Amino acid sequence: MEKILRVDKIQKYYGNKDNLTKAIDGISFDVEEGEFIGIMGASGSGKTTLLNCISTIDTVSSGHIYLEEQDITEIKEENIAKFRRDNLGFIFQDFNLLDTLTIEENIALILTINKIPEKDIDNKVKEFAKKLGIEDILNKYPYQVSGGQKQRCASARAIVNSPKIILADEPTGALDSKSAKQLLETLENMNSKLKATILMVTHDPLSASY
């Protein structure tokens, strides 16, 4: 399989030499196309920092991160937003949905920003909404649906643009046990049937076992 992500000896420090905090200390690993990898660790162990560095939200102190053959630690500031839109999908613990947009509009947002034709947007949104079991709530707003439905909306938004990799940061953290299990099954389905490559960080052993 093709190597999608390569993390090479990255370090991330905060503070100064008199009060230095090591958030990440020399981590290396690879993610191949089609894999669903879970990284488990306690709160404060650097999991979110790791995802932030991979997603270009934060910068590394040293080391390199490659998405396919591109060293993303070298991307210029003015090109970062486009890089994220073109290559990455995100699923956050707190959903990060816009309350003023419907579920359908939230899923479609990245396609709209990328100026995809309206007919294609409509077809793609409906396709993924059906596959993730939320086609009946597309006209509702986030505050009108459950936490589990919000997270499935976020999952649809993450995959609708066919990203090279989906980054999931504690995606079950705000869900009850039933909704968490349903979401994990959704992610597993996205990986096995929709061929999504997923890197998830979590403190939950059940989530990591998927």
Feature-to-residue mapping (PLM):
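Exposed loop/turn and edge beta-strand positions of beta-sandwich/beta-sheet ligand-binding modules
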Residues: 1
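ABC family nucleotide-binding domain
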Residues: 4-5, 10-210
